Amino acid sequence: MEKLSKDFFGNEVLICGCSDKDNLYYKRLNKAFLSNGITVYPMPTTPESELGFKTYKSYTDLPIIPKCAYILSYKSKTSEIIDELSGLGVNKIAFYGNACVDDEILHKCDSLGIETRLGCPMMLFASGFCWIHAKIAGVKR
């Protein structure tokens, strides 16, 4: 699998699995994408989530379906999300980390023709600890 890069996201990204459990992270993530010219379409795991910015309750609420998605859910939900995204024409998916994905899920994506990456986009866009994490992980910014 190739390393995550800014180009992977293109101009827009659908974020699946964001919740109000870690509100600060999602606010920073949203800001980081927007600051880099990437339009964000967040879909919380619970529609009642109040993240402090616009979210979408379902795929039908989205004004467009981005070709790229970023998944922040547990493995138990990821496979179902991939089925939905594949049916909507999403062809690139980045996963937050190992809690979201395993080899079986990656093979499923491959069989569906979905390009995948693993890693937190904050390593690409943020500073401070995220910048240090990017250096350790070998992520080129």
Language-model segment annotations:
Residues 1-51:
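Hydrophobic, well-ordered beta-alpha structural blocks that scaffold small-molecule cofactor pockets
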Residues 36-38, 88-92, 112-115:
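A short helix->loop->beta-strand "cap" motif at the edges of active sites that frequently abuts
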Residues 46-74:
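Mobile, glycine- and charge-enriched loop segments
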Residues 50, 63-65, 101-126:
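Short acidic, glycine/proline-enriched helix-loop-strand junctions
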Residues 70-78, 95-100:
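N-terminal glycine-rich "phosphate-gripper" loop used for MgATP/nucleotide binding
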Residues 85-109:
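ADP-ribose/adenylate-binding Rossmann-like module
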Residues 126-141:
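A charged, well-structured terminal subsegment
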